[in-house]
Amino acid sequence: MQGSMRLWLSVLTFTLSLLICLGTLADAYPSKPDNPGEDAPAEDMAKYYSALRHYINLITRQRYGKRSNPETMVSDVWWRESTENIPRSRFEDPSMW
């Protein structure tokens, strides 16, 4: 009886934490601006196009992660297992001379 109660309590806790995590992820993404309609005044259309431009810039911007960090690139070069994959400078290439 007590084992069954613990199982249901852990399932309930996991489900609630999963729902909270999914809710925060859904709020993090920007929402598309509402279209004011075809017969809207020029000021509303200008605001809509400005908001739409901002929305498009947000969702299409480039995102840079840890791989572009110079410190991680140096550590990858130092701790790599084989030396075959290390990029060579173009001056080491015999065809350049």
UniProtKB/Swiss-Prot annotation:
Keyword field: Amidation, Cleavage on pair of basic residues, Neuropeptide, Secreted, Signal
Main location: secreted
Signal peptide positions (record): 1-28
InterPro entries xrefs: Pancreatic_hormone-like, Pancreatic_hormone-like_CS
Tissue expression from the record: Expressed throughout the brain with highest levels of expression in medial pallium, basal forebrain, preoptic area, midbrain tegmentum and trigeminal nucleus.
GO biological process: feeding behavior; neuropeptide signaling pathway
Location of the protein in the cell: Secreted
GO CC terms: extracellular space
A Pfam cross-reference name: Hormone_3
Entry GO MF terms: neuropeptide hormone activity; neuropeptide Y receptor binding
Residue numbers carrying Tyrosine amide: 64
Similarity comment: Belongs to the NPY family.
Function summary: NPY is implicated in the control of feeding and in secretion of gonadotrophin-release hormone.
Name assigned to this protein: Pro-neuropeptide Y
Species in which this protein is naturally found: Typhlonectes natans (Rubber eel)
Gene designation: npy
